[in-house]
Amino acid sequence: MKKILAPSILSADFKVLGEQIRMTADKGAKYLHFDVMDGMFVPSISFGMPVLKSIRGGTSQVMDVHLMVMDPIRYVDAFHEAGADILTVHLEACQDMQAVLDKIHASGMKAGVSVKPGTAIESLSPILEQADMFLIMCVEPGFGGQAFIPESLDRIKNLRTMLDEKGLKTDIEVDGGIYLTNVREVIDAGANIIVAGSAVFNGSISKNVTGFMEIFKEYE
């Protein structure tokens, strides 16, 4: 499966956000990852539809939106209107997951489902064929710059095995504590979409993105 880098703008410098986004695109990052937090599902508060809509007007990158909010079905239409291409919701935050997935698909967006580190991967079994992407959190969601949880590798492997057994080539995205030094491990475990915040935006953005792209070429 094609390996894709999704720089997380939560780690960007918002004073020069447009410039930094262009740097990621110029070096080959096809996605942009947006962590939307409501201060309830997770402790932090980040940004919402206006930021997404503003960025949408300046890039052709895939808008990959991760909703870390309670009862996310309330926001599906608003994020679609703001320009989201992929809308990922948390299994733990949805009262009726099927209804949420149906609403996302009806809007024309791709639907992702995310799980926290403490949620059993097996809990995704009923919706393996319903989602377009699964996002495995490799840190506790809500804050950037945390250390990668090593047990995440087995969780990625288990999910890829579950998908393979059903003949599904569904994307597995991973987020949290991923750097050039450990990205091969998550790819080897079965992930193909890599969210990176600090690893992209700290230091030379061009050099960092190029580093990920060079590793991805090893898997072509």
PLM segments and residue spans:
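Structural preference for solvent-exposed beta-strand-turn elements
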Residues: 104-106, 168
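Non-catalytic terminal and connector segments of soluble metabolic enzymes
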Residues: 15-19, 163-167, 172-173, 186
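Conserved N-terminal beta1-alpha1 strand-loop-helix module at the mouth
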Residues: 1-88, 94-96, 103, 110-111, ...
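Acidic, divalent-metal-coordinating active-site segment for phosphoryl/phosphodiester hydrolysis
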Residues: 177-189
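Glycine-rich beta-strand-to-loop/alpha-helix junction loops that act as flexible
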Residues: 172-177, 195-199
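Short beta->alpha connector loops at strand-helix junctions that form conserved
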Residues: 90-92, 116, 137-140, 197-198
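Short, electropositive alpha-helical surface patch
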Residues: 84-92, 187-195
